[in-house]
C-alpha cells in the first residue's frame, strides 16, 4: 500500500481531533477510509469495497460502535465501545466481519457482526486490501 495515510485533524461533527484518510492512488490495491458517526459499519464497508471494485479483500480496522449485534452471540448493548476487526475479516462477494468489542465496564464481546446492527460511535478507521 503506497500513497495514503491517516492524518489527525479536527473534526467539526465530533469536536475531537481524529484520523482522516488522506492521499492515495486511483489504481491502488488498497483503500483507507474513516467511517463517520451513525453509519452502519457493515454497509459502509460494502460500499467502499464496491466502489474500489475488489473481488476479494482482507479488512482491517479499529474504531468505536454504538452497540453491536452478533450472529449467534450475545449483543454488546453499551452506547460506547472500543472495537477491533481481528484477522479473518474478508470480502469474497459477501462480507465476513468478525468483531471484538470492549465496553466501559470491561464487558468483552466478539463474533460475526450482524449487518445493519452496528452503527459507528465517534469514528472507525479501516484499511481494505485486495487479495
Where are these regions (language model features)?
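Structural motif
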Residues: 56-58, 98, 125-126
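A broad, low-specificity signal for short, low-complexity segments enriched in glycine/proline
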Residues: 18-21, 58-63, 86-89
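Residues at beta-strand starts and edge strands
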Residues: 29, 55, 93-95, 122
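N-terminal intrinsically disordered, cationic/polar leader segments
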Residues: 69-95, 103, 107-109, 113-119, ...
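Short, well-structured hydrophobic secondary-structure segments
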Residues: 36-79
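Short amphipathic
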Residues: 28-36
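Mixed-charge, glycine-accented linear interaction segment located at domain edges/termini
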Residues: 1-20, 35, 102-131
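Gly-rich Lys/Arg/Thr-decorated short loops/hinges at beta-loop-alpha junctions or inter-strand turns
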Residues: 20-28
Amino acid at each position: 500500500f503506497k500513497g495514503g495515510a491517516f492524518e489527525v485533524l479536527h473534526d467539526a461533527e465530533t469536536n475531537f481531533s481524529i484520523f482522516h484518510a488522506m492521499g492515495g492512488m486511483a489504481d491502488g490495491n488498497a483503500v483507507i477510509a474513516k467511517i463517520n458517526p451513525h453509519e452502519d459499519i457493515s454497509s459502509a464497508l460494502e460500499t467502499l469495497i464496491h466502489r474500489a471494485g475488489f473481488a476479494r479483500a482482507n479488512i482491517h480496522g479499529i474504531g468505536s460502535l454504538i452497540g453491536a449485534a452478533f450472529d449467534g452471540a450475545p449483543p454488546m448493548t453499551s452506547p460506547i465501545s472500543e472495537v477491533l476487526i481481528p484477522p479473518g475479516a474478508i470480502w469474497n462477494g459477501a462480507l465476513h466481519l468478525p468483531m471484538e468489542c470492549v465496553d466501559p465496564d470491561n464487558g468483552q464481546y466478539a463474533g460475526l457482526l450482524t449487518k445493519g446492527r452496528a452503527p459507528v460511535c465517534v469514528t472507525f478507521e479501516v484499511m481494505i486490501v485486495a487479495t
